UniProtKB/Swiss-Prot annotation:
Protein name: Phosphopantetheine adenylyltransferase
Keyword Magnesium in annotation: yes
Amino-acid positions noted as binding ATP in the UniProt annotation, renumbered to this chain: T10, F11, H18, G89, I90, R91, E99, W124, R125, Y126, L127, S128, S129, T130
Species, as recorded: Actinobacillus pleuropneumoniae serotype 5b (strain L20)
A single cellular component GO annotation: cytoplasm
Length: 158
C-alpha cells in the first residue's frame, strides 16, 4: 500500500538538512508532499512564492515528491490531501518536547494523523535555516549548506 505523507515547514531557506529528510522520506513512502507554510507572523528572507518554487526546484529529481504552498492549519491541509502522516525532522532533545506536543495537537485536530520523526543524517544534525540566514547576512559562504537552486537565488539577492 502506498501512503501520502506531508513534510511541512517555512523553508526559509531550504537547506541540505531539509533535502536529506525529504529524500529519505521519498524512499519510505509512496508520495511526499512538501508543504511550504505561508506563516505571516515571520519576516522571511524569501517570499512565499519564492520558497515554494525553490523547494520545487530542489526536489525536481524526486518523482514522488511535490511542493505545495499552504496557509491555515496543517491538520486541515493533511485532510485535504488524504495524508496518513506527517514527517518531522528532529535534531535532538531540544526539539522533542515541542514536536511531541505538535504531533498530539495535529492528531487531535485531524481525527487521526500520525507523525513520523526522522533524525537528520549526522552530516546535517546541527544545521537550521536560521543558521544559514545568519551566515548569509554576514556574507559567509553557504554553498555547502543549501541546494544549488537556493544558492543561486541567494546570489541573485546580493
Amino acid at each position: 500500500m502506498s501512503y501520502t505523507v506531508i513534510y511541512a515547514g517555512t523553508f526559509d531557506p531550504m537547506t541540505n538538512g531539509h533535502l536529506d529528510i525529504i529524500e529519505r522520506a521519498s524512499e519510505l513512502f509512496g508520495q511526499v508532499i512538501v508543504a511550504v507554510a505561508k506563516n505571516p507572523s515571520k519576516q522571511p528572507l524569501f517570499s512565499f512564492e519564492e520558497r515554494t518554487a525553490l523547494v520545487r526546484q530542489s526536489c525536481a529529481h524526486l518523482a514522488n515528491v511535490q511542493a505545495v504552498g499552504f496557509s491555515g492549519l496543517l491538520a486541515d491541509f493533511a485532510k485535504q490531501h488524504q495524508a496518513k502522516a506527517l514527517v518531522r525532522g528532529i535534531r535532538g532533545s531540544d526539539d522533542i518536547e515541542y514536536e511531541i506536543q505538535l504531533a498530539q495537537l495535529n492528531d487531535k485536530l485531524s481525527g487521526r494523523l500520525d507523525t513520523v520523526f526522522l533524525p537528520p543524517s549526522v552530516t546535517w544534525r546541527y544545521l537550521s535555516s536560521t543558521m544559514v540566514r545568519e551566515i548569509y547576512r554576514h556574507q559567509g559562504d553557504v554553498a555547502q549548506f543549501v541546494p544549488n537552486a537556493v544558492l543561486c537565488a541567494l546570489k541573485e539577492k546580493e
